[in-house]
Amino acid sequence: MARNRDPFTQALASLRDRIHSGALAGGAPVIVQDEAQRLRLSTTPVREALARLSGEGLVERAASGGYVTVRFDATAARDRWAMHAHYVMIAVELNARALGPRRPPAPPFEPDRPIASANRLFSSLVCSAGNRVLWDAFLNVSGQLDLVRRYEAVLFDDLGDEARGLYAAYSRAIRPEFAEAVGRYHDRRMGAAGALAALVFGGAGPPDAGTGGEE
């Protein structure tokens, strides 16, 4: 771990990565003293980082005190995919209203990182809508979905084609083609929410399918 970052940022990045990677499984207690010792920090930045992650919906207060990681069940996954779709579609409408048939430039497509490429396309579109409340809400739910995204390649063998199709639809018309592609993208994930949540709960090691998060 690099030591050139402030303690809070270091603790936040490390804890978020451990949650997203599954090193801290859903429902697991996060022991402040242990995490501080692992990072060679005092407990203060670790507690501050956990408070931030609680606001992001990645940890929650335990009944006995301290924090536990959020357990992601099928309902939670389905609800968050539905909200993610809602935020992207709001951005589609805001951009169409402001720009007409024109579209903000799409980020580069990386064939070997289809999940990350799709995420960046959605993020770019929401960011370009120019609504800070929408952007913050999108980032929050997108960060929570990183818990299940890493397992998509276990269920779907066409992630590259799917992401390429999103980019192609976006290049042609934001409405209706891209909007329809966004709907299909989210519908299949909401339909697979139970299976994705089961993979998260089981802690299976996912294959590498370009699962890098927002950049």
Language-model region placement:
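A ubiquitous short alpha-helical element
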Residues: 1, 50, 106-110, 126-130, ...
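Short, hydrophobic secondary-structure boundary micro-motifs
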Residues: 26-28, 62, 103-104, 134-138, ...
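Amphipathic, non-membrane alpha-helical segments in soluble helical-bundle scaffolds
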Residues: 5, 43, 47, 74-81, ...
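Short linear motifs at protein or domain termini
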Residues: 1-93, 97, 202, 213-214
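All-alpha effector-binding/dimerization core of bacterial HTH-type transcriptional repressors
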Residues: 70-130, 165-181
